[in-house]
Amino acid sequence: MKSFLYVIYQVLLLPHIILYKRSKNRALIDQDLERWAEAKKINKSKTGLLLYFLTHATDFRTIFYFRLNNLYKHILNFYCRKENRFTIDITTKIKGGILTGHPYCTILNADSIGENFYVNHLVTIGEINGKRPTIGNNVNIYTGAIIIGGITIGNHCSIGAGAVVTKSIPDNCVVVGNPAKIIKKDGKRIEN
């Protein structure tokens, strides 16, 4: 019975595959698929990966619908639901390779987010007075972090759990605390 339902679900995903193949953002979706496959240690074709993650990961579905950015995503969401507690603002520009770790109650409202971005649950990236953060490449943001305002998070940064970041952070930093403090820069511990 389970395998029968699985086959039915795969048939329902055919419109997703067609839209993926015709998407102007296909290269970004491919980067996302590669990152997810690497993290989950899954080796399949791109179409196989797409079917797998659309079937098993509502957070991936949310990212996929964000990448489609057309009317069809609303129709697809009627029968193949996205994660409704994971919000990506439609004006946020996100490069490829986004990976999520259970993004329950996570809001991404940045000006832009670079490649190979990782985000955990309960994270808020938001605006103050219309100014939104810019996030660099290879940035990891962990549980409960808050990043707000017109600030820049540099490349290769990690924002620790519960950190509240209201000031720009340079490249290659590890940041923790409320208010956020840099504890490592370029791999070297910083004494505050």
What are these regions (language model features)?
Residues 1-83, 192:
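Terminal amphipathic alpha-helical/low-complexity segments used for targeting or macromolecular assembly
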Residues 1-2, 25, 45-48, 59, ...:
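Serine/threonine-rich low-complexity intrinsically disordered regions
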Residues 81-176, 180-183:
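Structural signal for interior beta-strand "rungs" in well-ordered beta-sheet cores
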Residues 185-192:
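Generic C-terminal helix-cap and adjacent flexible tail
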